[in-house]
Structure formats: C-alpha cells, structure tokens
C-alpha cells in the first residue's frame, strides 16, 4: 500500500480510514461553519469575459480552491514546487483543482430559517416536538401570526397564537410582561426553551395514567422523538438554520457553451436567489426598515431556502427561465434518476460491450463465440502488457499503435490472452441470477456474439434480434469467482425449484423425439443386433430405418457395493434411434431412461436423473451431446408444416349441430320462464365450452392416430407422424389449445373485461373466419398485447420490492439449534394430490424424528437433510406428515442458519454460509411474474375457462369420510342435502392416508354416507353450479314477513315469457326510508298456526331472504326439511388468467386487507344473535366461562354460522376473503405461513410454474421481522412501539439475566413495502422509496447504520457481506475485535 501512497498526492493520512457504521444526524451551525472554507457573500458566478470566478461569489477560487492544478488565479504561483502556498494577491491556495469537488462554503443567514424537511415531511417533526399543529407552525413561520414564547405573569399560554391585532391589544394590556415572536425566531425560541428531559418525564407519567388508545399512540410518538434527541445529544433548535452550507462548485458546474451562453446546474439559480434575498434583508435591517417590509423579506428568504432544499414541497415550485421547476437538493438524491438509484446502486462499468446474439450450435456448454473486434477492444490492457513483455513494443503508446494496425502478432497474443479467461454475458432484463453467466470466449469472425442454445432458457433469450452485453472480470479473484461460481456449466439447476434449467427445447426436442419414436412395419423390423456398432452399420447402409423396432445387446455400467462401475450386458427390445442414442449416455445412467419416445418432460427428467446419478461434469457433457444429436436428427427428419397437416375432424359438423340444438332448447326454456336470463347465459356458455372441448378431443384423436398395415398384414393404429401433432406432442412448439384453433374450432372469445361472448367462433384458421368472427377475435387478441405492455412494469416493480425486503438475508451460521418447524403435508385440492409430500420436504432438514406409522421405528432422526433416497423411503412407509425446519422459525439474529434453510436448490447440497438466500428468493418469485404477463398474449384472447363444475367424483378407491364441519339434513325424497358452509368429503386409502379432499357447496345433494367404501369414478355429490339455494332445516308451513310487493320484493315479469317471479330488492334502492330497514323473512308455523322454534331454545325459526334472491315458495305452502326456499343466481363467470395472478401475489405480499374481508371467530364458544341495529346484525360468541364477544355485521354479508353452533377461535364465521392479519392474530404464525404459501403457489401453479415453498417462506420471515411491544416490562422500549424481533429477543435475554421483567410482544405482519421502509438500515430504506421521509426520520433519531445488508455495502462501495465477501467482513470484524482487546489490555498495563 505504501507504494500507492507515493503516487497519490491527495492521500493525506486518514483518507483510507476504515469504518464500520455510518451515523446520520442534524448538523449544528458550528459544524456547518467548521466544514466551510469561507463565506459566499455575492450571487455572482464567473466573469463572462475572462471566465474567471468572481471573488466571494458562488465559484470563488479563494473559498473553494484553484481552477487549474497547482496554479493560483492571478498566475503568480505556478507548478508543483509552490504546493500549499497561499497567494497574497488573490488569496488562492496552490493545490489540486479537484479540491473544488470537496470544499464547502457557507452563507450566514440574516434571519433564522426553518428546515423544510422537519416542517413539511409528514408527520411534521417540528409539530411533534412542540405539540402544535402544522397549520399553526406554518402561520408563525410565514409571518401570519405571533406565537407566545414566554407568557411571564400574564394569563396567556406558552405556544398560544396571536393575530397582529390581538398582539397589539395584549401589548397595550400587559406591556412588556410577556414575549411573543414571529417567524423562525419564534419557533427557535420555543425549541430552545423546551426542557427535553423534563418533558420526557411528564410524558412517561401521562402514558401510564391515560386510557385512550389514540392518546397513547400520540404520546408514544412524541416520546420517541424527544428521547431520540435526548439520547443523541442533538439540540432541538438545530432544526432551525442560521447558517446554510454551500455545495462545492464542481458538484454544481457552470459550463460555457459556444455562442457565449452557459449551461448551469439548477442549484446555482437556487443559491443565487437565497444570496440575493439574504443580502437585501441584511441591508433592510441595517437601514431599520419598517417591520412590514422586513417581514416580507424574511418570508421570501424562508421560501428561497425551502426551494433550495426541496423545491415544490411547499407552495408552487420555483421555475427557471424555461418554466420547468428547478431541481433542488432533495430531487438530486431521490427517485430513479437520483443519487441513490442512478449512481450508487446502478453504476456503469468499463471493459464491457454489447452486440446481437446468434446461435452457436457447435459450442460446448461453457463456451461462447466472441467477435474478434470486440475481444481486441475488451482485452486491450492485457494485450498491451503481453506486447511489452515480449518486447514487440517498448511503450504503451507503441503497443496501442500495433493494436490499431492489427498486425498479425496481435491476433496471436489475443488468442493467448483470452485462453481460459472467462467473460460474463448478460441479457437485459436480468430477472434472476442466471441472467448473467460466465463463458470461455472462442474468437469468431463476424460481429455477432454466438450463444449456446441450451442457456437460452436461463437468459430467456431468443435469436430474433436480442442483444447481450459482455463484461470482462479483470482481477484474478474476479476471474476465479466467475469460473467457479458463474460458469454456465456450473449452473445446471434452477435456483427457483432445483430442476435442470439446461433443458433442450424447440428443434432439439423435436429431433430427439423423432429419433426415439417407433414405426410399425418399418424396414428391417424384428432384426437382432449384437451391439450398437452393428446397429450403426445397418442404419448407414439403409438396412433399417430410424424407427425400426429391433432387439439389441447393450452394455451398461452399474455401480457395485464399492461404488465402482461394472459392465452389465442386457438385451433390450428397442428402436434403432434409441440404440444410437444409448451411445451418448453417461456411465451409470440406465438405458430405460431413453427407451421410450423422448418428449420435453422426459428429457428434463433424463437430465435431472443424470445430475443425481452421474454428477455435474458428466451431465454437462451429456447435455451437449443431446443437443448435437437433437439438432442433427431434426435436420435429417425434415419435419415441416403444411396446410394439409391441419386435419379437420369429420365429427365437427355433427357436434356443432348438437350444440346448436341444445342452445335452442335453453332459449325455449328461457321463453317459458323456467330459467332466468343469467342462467341462460351461463348454460349457453357451458354448452359451447363443452362443444369446443369435444371437437378438440375428436381432432386430437384424429390427428394422433393413423392406420397402417403391420407385418402380419393386419390394419392397426399407430401413433401419427403428422408434423403438427409431433411438434405439440413432443413439447417442441405449440399446444393442444393452439392446434384446436388451427383445425378444431376457435371457440369462445373473451371481451377485454374478461367476460365471455356467448356466440363462439365455430370456424378454425384453416377454414378461415367470417368478418364478424374476425372482429370478435381481434377484440381479445388486442387486449393481450396491451396487457403485456402494462403488466411487465408491474412485475418488475414487484421484484424490486421483494429484493428490497429480503436483501440483507444471508446464511450466516450452520445451525441455530432450534427444534421449531412446520408440519408439512401433501397438498390435496379437489381430487388430486397437487403436490406430494416428498416434493414438499425434499431438501429440507427434519425438525423432529420421522416415525414409521405402522412399526413405530424411527426412519429419520431430527436434524437430517432429506435427500431423494430418504424422501422415497418416507414416501413408501406411508408417513402422512413430517415436521421440517423452515426459515420462518429460524432463531439466528441477523440472517439465517443453513439447517433452517436446507438444500441450496441450485447446487443440490446443504446451503453454504454466505449464500444470499433472500435475494435468490425474491428473484425466484419475481422472475416468473414477468414471464406470466407475457404468456397470455400468445393464445390470443381465446377464453380459457373450465365449464362450471356441477358434481364431484372420486378418483381412487377408498373410504369416504365427512369433515368435522359437515352438516346435512335428509329431505322428503330421502336425499341428503348439505347445509354446512365449509364442508368437505375426504377419501382415505386402505392404510388411512388422505388421498383426496373435495369441497361440497351449501345445498349440494350427497350421494355417499360417512364411512362408506367407494370406487373410483363414483359420484360423491351433485349441485346446480349457477344458482345458490337457500334451504330450510325445519319442516312447517310458510309464513312470510315483510314480503311486500313493491316495497321489499319486486314482481319481475319476463318480457319473453310473461311469467312472474318475486325478487328481493336491495335495501339501498328502496323508496321510503322506513322500508330500507325491513328485511323480507320467512317463518314456519306448525299445524296449529304456532311459530316453530329452534329445538332446545325459545327462539322462533326465522330465515331472511338475501338481496337478489328469487323466492320459490308461496305463502301457506307446506315444506319439509331440506327444501329450497329461494334461489340466488350466481354472477356469470369470467376468464381466469395471471392478471388475477400477479396483482394477487402483490396483494398477498403487501399483506393488504381484502376489500370485503370475511370474519374469523375471536374466541372459542357458542354463537347467538343479539338485537339487530339499522342494517347490521349483532353476532355474539360466548365462551365456556360466559365471557361474550360481540360484533356487528352488515346484513349484505353471508353469515356462515347459525344460532347455537359451537365455533373454534380462528374459524370463519362470515363469508369473504380472509384477512391475513386476522389469521396471524388468531391462529398463529404457522397458519399464516401456510395460507400465504398456498395462495401464492396457487397463482403460479395455474400457469405451470414451479417455485419452492422455501422462497415464499423466506419472504414471510421478512414480513414478520418486526413486533409490537404490548408491555415494555423493565426493558428500554416504549409500549406500543414497533421494533425488530431480534432486538426484543436480545433485550429480553439481558433482562432475564439481570433478573428484570422482560417485554411482552405481539407478532405483526408488515407488507413488503412497509417492511423495507421500516428496516434498521436507513441507507437501504432511503434508496428504496420515500427518500426524504426516511432521511428526515433517521436524522432526528440520530440513527446509525451498521451496514449489515447487501445494499448498504454496495452504496458505500464495499464488498457485500455475502458469498466470498462474507469472509472478508468476518476477518475485518475479527481484526477489529483483536485491536479493541489490545487497546483494553494496554490501558490496563498503563494504569
């Protein structure tokens, strides 16, 4: 390091200081003066003739330093030998001109001025400290009122406002007994005379005595600010400024343009205004001008300083000559173009270039093709060095010349330099860490970068004109990291789900599929071959075809006990293509993996298996060979598309006719009044949806089979070799949905709002569309395009918020030693096991022993990482649930431990210390978001909606069980009618494991009994999907109450049918105010005309009709249990797609309270209903001890419980979306985590995107990182404040050690934006959002940033404390501790 110091004249001692934290505070006037090198007295900038700075002006050389290196302004002293001399003529110190970037000046203000950030940044800090409203403070500051600063012996109050008239009246009355001031002086006086310590005492006492919640909150806020001031030793009056610092001139440059004009930074304008007004005010004060004039000038000065600090925050923004607002100091640092995001977090780097990408099908996975021109430019310094070293050039200049002339030696040297020097390729947008990968460059001619096709999936690149950037790692360490961590061949698995991301697609898949398909009766069928070489010869001499079925002897390599490979020879029935493919299989991969037609999914499985069985190196080589082979056979196969390949099924006409007939029938029923218009629409849409599916099925059946003659001469079906079918079937391109549009029928289309147009497009693209059909189609297709453009931005913003909330989460230790965890079960939805238990626990660490349910022996001990082998064993033993460790319950303070996180998905083993798991989680969730937004636009607006379900069927054999919430009654026909709201039928297999779980809606008819044995395919329950019934649980005679035509119900006569029905009117729409409160209800009478009561109570049965219900019973009608009283038509369905998805994910992570949230029971107890109020019902839950909890529920909402029902705490009692905050409060962290994980996964699953639960849990951990102090105990916290969980834990441990009372706290769920802003690091929060507010708050609190996260370290320009940087930080920390210890020891010896 000493050598460097010689060459760096600025390197005075102490420039290289190491620091461990950054503290922010309010600068005192003394501090500001100590920074300054002189006072700026004049608004002049530079002399426009000589271009020299004016003295005492904004660019003064005397204050800020010389304009030219080592040269004073008048030119008396020049050169290095006068370094440090101050010229006696012009007063300029002879030194480097770059001091003009760091020397500050100051302006002495003639009157104090309030700092706008402390005044206007909400909540107003000045207002908080003084306990005055913002409006009042502004009136004082801007000279509209006086404030009493010292009431003396008068009855006036301190801080009381007086208008001018009041003030003069009081002056007459009391004379000089009191003091009142105007402007910033008045506020400053109030601040100066406030006794902080005393005020804190008073507030603490008030806190204990007061009972009102709002008051507690208000006092706690004020207390926090005052305590911060008290602790940090900052004075309150520093929020009012006497001195204004002036930014160094080179940071607000003035550049002469040609033509005698100047380009200047807006700050100079703002400073000029301040100086002008300040000087004018000084003169006015010297002249003893009248009060009113001085006041006006002071107000103008205040406004000028406001504009300089934060233009436009108060009043109108100051504008320059061109009418746009001037850019103030605050604007310089905030927003996307501000200092934080533009310059500190987003730097541009040298040694980089970009170019278009093309395919490099002959490359190996770790290589890329780099154009010679680019390489020459990028590796210049290395080439210069080599040229000098070999003596071809004596100076850098000479070397430069040689390179420019491109002499032959230069190319040889370039080859040498480039060898084994990895470069990094990046494609924007970089959505996850695989968006930048390292490759070894291969020099190529031309100007395009060649990219290996298999990494396209990771970069999301295609070759339609995409560009990529190249970066060169310079230092040895950087090259090493690029090679070991970032080389493409080291990134085979995706960090999001642990599956291979190096997976063949498109042509490669098509080639491999074509190669491994079998043909019936191909040339040479049934031949026997001794080995693969023989197959080769036969194929090349055209004795056999690629798809010929043959028998062949193959040698495979199998591991023995010792783990060494041994050859095993087997005979296989296979095809020629598969036998040829067997040659490239790595050792240890069984042939049966390729002995089938390889589709995209199969190939992915193949690569996965290869990675697990044969390791990384072999897999990479294998993937490359797969690619070469695939491309080769895709070329030989000659698969193309012709119009004739789109075969239209013969059954189409019949199916359309059938659908038309059904629609006609529904229309007839509608005319007769048997169905409402809404039901008609729903049924029509369903019919067309089904017809489309049937045609699609007929088409696919037709496409996928073709008739051929086999060897015996019989006609048989074989899988088709239709090009379009092969493309879709192999997964290379296209899907059944797209083929359906080509040769089936286009089907139903959606309007831009998502509702479905009921007339479908019956033609397909091959037949062509009529004008009307074409118009309907464009409707949806254009929406797709518009959506994509709009949604990409949203998705990027979601990723940004996620990264920001998790950026400081790093694995810092091996094991935190907790035994907490979550219990994992398989995810069962509808009839299917959506995610098996094995997939959910793979790569996790067990939190408790896993015990075999049948034998009771321990299968896996606690603390074991679950590998594929162990998971399979658990799966076979029939274990239903496993308790695993999770990031949410990890006890590590700052960061995570490896055991709670589990396996590093991209590497396949336990995660290493230093892995930035937070950022990986954020990227894994954010990256598919962008993909999902683009997915919609490819199908082109075709409606994708499942026909509404009207029944559930069992999918497997077993025993039917009813869930605990199941309630049903038997009606007169003997059918079981469900009357519970959240009922489920669960099916268990013979061992008793849950296999299926089906929701059955209210009003469904059950076709099975509890405990009944059932077969697969048996219907369990049926219901009407389009209406929701209202069912009676008691029998009797109908008696209506408040069912008055024209008041509470309307008689609706259908124009088409002439039939009338009674429909309940919405209370808000009713005419008279009295009728708004009436609720149409139905009561039941027995044969004597007495009201029937609920059994066991004296409450009469009374059921209210909901709004919009169509009443189906008449007054006086006899009804039995389970009969339908009314039908509520369901709204028509819309198409579901990721639009519902992305905002849904954002909503979950932002922890927003849903619009019409449902309600959960606060306590466990019995439900009863109390006295109703206007428009609300009173629901009461009484627990065992008789404590009642009551709540009012608006009548529009659907209550899911009934009188006398027992509910558990946290059970849903009012229908609606669940509020996550309620789940956390009533059911705890595990239930909350399960809810969020499930909901987020559902969105992604709908799109077929796999993300590990782990990543979502990491984010939930960050959302739960703060807690609310419920009772501070004897710790230093304030009751009601929000603090980091780790801080409370630490404080409680300390309190318990000292025998004090620990604090009690409640969990809080914060949305990701809020969590990012409430982080302890103010640098991280300020660079995220609301910069002004964050910095203001931090300055007042005198916050210290410990630089723990990644972001803060990037901003201060250090290695990040993750990955290889973690060791650097740790060693520094250790050294620091050792130094501290030494100093402590020396002090002891000194004493």
Curated annotation (Swiss-Prot):
Keywords per UniProt: DNA-directed RNA polymerase, Magnesium, Metal-binding, Nucleotidyltransferase, Transcription, Transferase, Zinc
Domain of life of the source: Bacteria
Similarity remark: Belongs to the RNA polymerase beta' chain family.
Coiled coil: none
Function: DNA-dependent RNA polymerase catalyzes the transcription of DNA into RNA using the four ribonucleoside triphosphates as substrates.
Binding site for Mg(2+): 462, 464, 466
Cofactor note: Binds 1 Mg(2+) ion per subunit.
Single GO MF annotation: zinc ion binding
Catalytic activity, EC: 2.7.7.6
GO biological process assignments: DNA-templated transcription
Residues that hold Zn(2+) 2 according to the record: 816, 890, 897, 900
Family annotation (Pfam families): RNA_pol_Rpb1_1, RNA_pol_Rpb1_2, RNA_pol_Rpb1_3, RNA_pol_Rpb1_4, RNA_pol_Rpb1_5
Protein name as catalogued: DNA-directed RNA polymerase subunit beta'
Subunit structure: The RNAP catalytic core consists of 2 alpha, 1 beta, 1 beta' and 1 omega subunit. When a sigma factor is associated with the core the holoenzyme is formed, which can initiate transcription.
PANTHER family, sorted: DNA-DIRECTED RNA POLYMERASE, DNA-DIRECTED RNA POLYMERASE SUBUNIT BETA
GO CC terms in record: DNA-directed RNA polymerase complex
NCBIfam families: rpoC_TIGR
Keyword Cytoplasm: no
Binding site for Zn(2+) 1: 72, 74, 87, 90
Originating species: Neisseria meningitidis serogroup B (strain ATCC BAA-335 / MC58)
Obligatory cofactor(s): Mg(2+); Zn(2+)
UniProt xrefs under Gene3D superfamilies: 1.10.132.30, 1.10.150.390, 1.10.1790.20, 1.10.40.90, 2.40.40.20, 2.40.50.100, RNA polymerase II, clamp domain, RNA polymerase Rpb1, domain 3
């Amino acid at each position: 390091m000493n050598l460097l110091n010689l060459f760096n004249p600025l390197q005075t001692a102490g420039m290289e200081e190491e620091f461990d934290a950054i503290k922010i505070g309010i600068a005192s006037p003394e501090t500001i003066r100590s920074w300054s090198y002189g006072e700026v007295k004049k608004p002049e900038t530079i002399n426009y003739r000589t271009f020299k700075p004016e003295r005492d002006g904004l660019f003064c050389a005397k204050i800020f330093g010389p304009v030219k290196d080592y040269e004073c302004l008048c030119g008396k002293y020049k050169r290095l030998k006068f370094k440090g001399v101050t010229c006696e003529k012009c007063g300029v110190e002879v030194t480097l001109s770059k001091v003009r970037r760091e020397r500050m000046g100051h302006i002495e203000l003639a009157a104090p001025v309030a700092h706008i950030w402390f005044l206007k940044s909400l909540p107003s800090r000045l207002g908080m400290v003084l306990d005055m409203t913002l409006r009042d403070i502004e009136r004082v500051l801007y000279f509209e009122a006086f404030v009493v600063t010292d009431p003396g012996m008068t009855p006036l109050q301190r801080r009381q406002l007086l208008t001018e008239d009041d003030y003069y009246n009081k002056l007459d009355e009391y004379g000089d007994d009191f003091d009142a001031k105007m402007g910033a002086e008045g506020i400053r006086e109030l601040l100066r005379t406030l006794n902080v310590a005393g005020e804190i005492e008073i507030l603490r006492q008030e806190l204990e005595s007061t009972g009102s919640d709002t008051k507690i909150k208000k006092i706690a806020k004020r207390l926090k600010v005052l305590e911060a001031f008290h602790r940090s030793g900052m004075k309150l009056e520093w929020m009012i400024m006497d001195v204004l610092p002036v930014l160094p001139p080179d940071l607000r440059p003035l550049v002469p343009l040609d033509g005698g004009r100047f380009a200047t930074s807006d700050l100079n304008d703002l400073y000029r205004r301040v100086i002008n007004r300040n000087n004018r005010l000084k003169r006015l004060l010297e002249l003893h001008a009248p009060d009113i004039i001085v006041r006006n000038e002071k107000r103008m000065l205040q406004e000028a300083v406001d504009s300089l600090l934060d233009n436009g925050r108060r009043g109108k923004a100051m504008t320059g000559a061109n009418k746009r607002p001037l850019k103030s100091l605050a604007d310089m640092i905030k927003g996307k173009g501000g200092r934080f995001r533009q310059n500190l977090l987003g730097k541009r780097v040298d040694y980089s270039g970009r170019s278009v990408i093309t395919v490099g099908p002959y490359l190996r996975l770790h290589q890329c093709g780099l154009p010679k021109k680019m390489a020459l430019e990028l590796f210049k310094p290395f080439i210069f060095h080599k040229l000098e070293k070999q003596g071809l050039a004596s100076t850098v200049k000479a070397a430069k010349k040689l390179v420019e002339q491109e002499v032959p030696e230069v190319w040889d040297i370039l080859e040498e330099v480039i060898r084994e020097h990895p470069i990094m390729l990046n494609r924007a947008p970089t959505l996850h860490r695989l968006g930048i990968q390292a490759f070894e460059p291969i020099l190529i001619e031309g100007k395009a970068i060649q990219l290996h096709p298999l990494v396209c999936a990771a970069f999301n690149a295609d070759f339609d004109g995409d560009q990529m950037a190249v970066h060169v790692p310079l230092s040895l360490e950087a090259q090493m990291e690029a090679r070991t961590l970032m080389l493409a061949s080291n990134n085979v698995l995706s960090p999001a789900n642990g599956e291979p991301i190096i997976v063949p697609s498109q042509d490669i898949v098509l080639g491999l599929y074509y190669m491994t398909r079998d043909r019936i009766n191909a040339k040479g069928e049934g031949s026997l071959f001794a080995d693969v070489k023989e197959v080769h010869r036969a194929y090349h001499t055209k004795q056999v075809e690629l798809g010929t079925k043959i028998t062949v002897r193959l040698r495979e390599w199998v591991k023995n006990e010792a783990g060494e490979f041994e050859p095993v020879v087997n005979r296989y029935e296979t095809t020629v293509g598969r036998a040829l493919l067997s040659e490239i299989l790595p050792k240890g991969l069984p042939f049966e993996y390729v002995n089938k037609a390889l589709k995209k999914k199969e190939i992915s499985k193949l690569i996965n298996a290869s990675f697990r069985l044969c390791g990384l190196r072999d897999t990479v080589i294998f993937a490359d060979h797969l690619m070469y082979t695939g491309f080769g056979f895709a070329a030989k196969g000659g698969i193309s598309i012709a119009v004739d390949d789109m075969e239209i099924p013969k059954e189409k006409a019949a199916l359309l006719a059938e659908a038309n007939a059904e629609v006609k029938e529904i229309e007839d029923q509608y005319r007769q009044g048997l169905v409402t218009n809404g039901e008609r629409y729903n049924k029509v849409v369903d019919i067309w949806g089904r017809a489309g599916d049937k045609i699609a099925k007929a088409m696919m059946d037709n496409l996928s089979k073709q008739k051929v003659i086999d060897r015996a001469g019989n006609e048989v079906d074989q899988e088709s070799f239709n090009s379009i079918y092969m493309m879709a079937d192999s997964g290379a391109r296209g899907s059944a949905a797209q083929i359906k549009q080509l040769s089936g029928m286009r089907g139903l289309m959606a309007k831009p709002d998502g509702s479905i147009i009921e007339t479908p497009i019956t033609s397909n693209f091959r037949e062509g569309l009529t004008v009307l059909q074409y118009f309907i189609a464009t409707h949806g297709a254009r929406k797709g395009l518009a959506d994509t453009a709009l949604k990409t931005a949203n998705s990027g913003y979601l990723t940004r918020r996620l990264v920001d909330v998790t950026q400081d989460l790093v694995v810092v230790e091996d094991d935190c030693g907790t035994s907490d965890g979550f219990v994992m079960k398989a995810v069962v939805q509808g009839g299917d096991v959506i995610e098996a238990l094995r997939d959910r626990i793979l790569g996790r660490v067990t939190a408790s022993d896993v015990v075999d349910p049948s034998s009771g022996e321990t299968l896996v001990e606690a603390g074991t990482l679950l590998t594929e082998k162990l998971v399979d064993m658990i799966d076979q033993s029939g274990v239903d649930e496993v308790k695993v460790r999770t990031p949410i319950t990890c006890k590590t303070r700052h960061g995570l431990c490896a055991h709670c996180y589990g396996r590093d998905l991209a590497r396949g083993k336990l995660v290493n210390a230093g892995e930035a798991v937070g950022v990986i989680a954020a990227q894994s969730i954010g990256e598919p978001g962008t993909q999902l937004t683009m997915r919609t636009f490819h199908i082109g607006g075709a409606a994708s909606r499942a026909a509404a379900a009207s029944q559930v069927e069992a999918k497997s054999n077993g025993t039917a069980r009813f869930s605990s919430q199941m309630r049903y009654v038997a009606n007169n026909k003997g059918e079981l009618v469900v009357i519970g709201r959240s009922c489920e039928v669960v099916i268990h297999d013979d061992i008793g494991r849950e296999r299926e779980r089906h929701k059955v809606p209210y009003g469904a008819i059950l076709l099975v009994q509890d405990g009944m044995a059932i077969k697969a395919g048996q219907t369990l329950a049926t219901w009407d999907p389009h209406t929701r019934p209202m069912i009676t649980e008691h029998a009797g005679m109908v008696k209506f109450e408040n069912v008055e035509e024209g008041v509470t119900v309307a008689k609706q006569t259908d124009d088409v049918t002439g039939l009338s029905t009674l429909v309940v009117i919405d209370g808000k729409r009713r005419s008279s105010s009295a009728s708004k409160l009436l609720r149409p209800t139905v009561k039941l009478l027995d044969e004597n005309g007495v009201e029937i009561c609920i059994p066991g109570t004296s409450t009469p049965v009374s059921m209210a009709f909901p709004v919009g219900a169509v009443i189906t019973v008449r007054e006086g009608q006899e009804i039995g249990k389970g009969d339908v009283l009314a039908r509520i038509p369901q709204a028509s369905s819309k198409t579901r797609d990721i639009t519902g998805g992305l905002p849904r994910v954002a909503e979950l992570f932002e922890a927003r309270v849903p619009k019409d949230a449902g309600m959960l029971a606060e306590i466990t107890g019995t439900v009863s209903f109390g006295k109703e109020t206007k428009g609300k019902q009173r629901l009461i839950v009484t627990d065992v001890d008789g404590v009642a909890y009551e709540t009012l529920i608006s009548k529009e909402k659907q209550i899911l419980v009934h009188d006398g029902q027992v509910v558990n705490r946290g059970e849903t009692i009012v229908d609606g979306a669940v509020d996550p905050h309620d789940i956390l409060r009533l059911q705890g962290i595990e239930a909350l985590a399960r809810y969020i994980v499930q909901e987020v996964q559902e969105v992604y699953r709908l799109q077929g995107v796999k993300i590990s639960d782990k990543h979502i849990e990491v984010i939930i951990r960050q959302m739960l990182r703060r807690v609310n102090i419920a009772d501070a105990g004897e710790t230093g916290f304030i009751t009601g404040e929000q603090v980091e969980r780790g801080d409370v834990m630490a404080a409680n441990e300390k309190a318990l050690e000292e025998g004090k009372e620990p604090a009690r706290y409640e969990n809080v769920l914060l949305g990701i934006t809020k969590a990012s802003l409430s982080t302890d690091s103010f640098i991280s929060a300020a660079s995220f959002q609301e910069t002004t507010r964050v910095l203001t708050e931090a300055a007042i609190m005198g916050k210290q940033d410990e630089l723990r996260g990644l972001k803060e370290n990037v901003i201060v320009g250090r290695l990040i404390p993750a990955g290889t940087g973690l060791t650097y930080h740790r060693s520094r920390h250790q050294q620091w501790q050792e130094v501290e210890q030494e100093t402590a020891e020396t002090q002891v010896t000194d004493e």
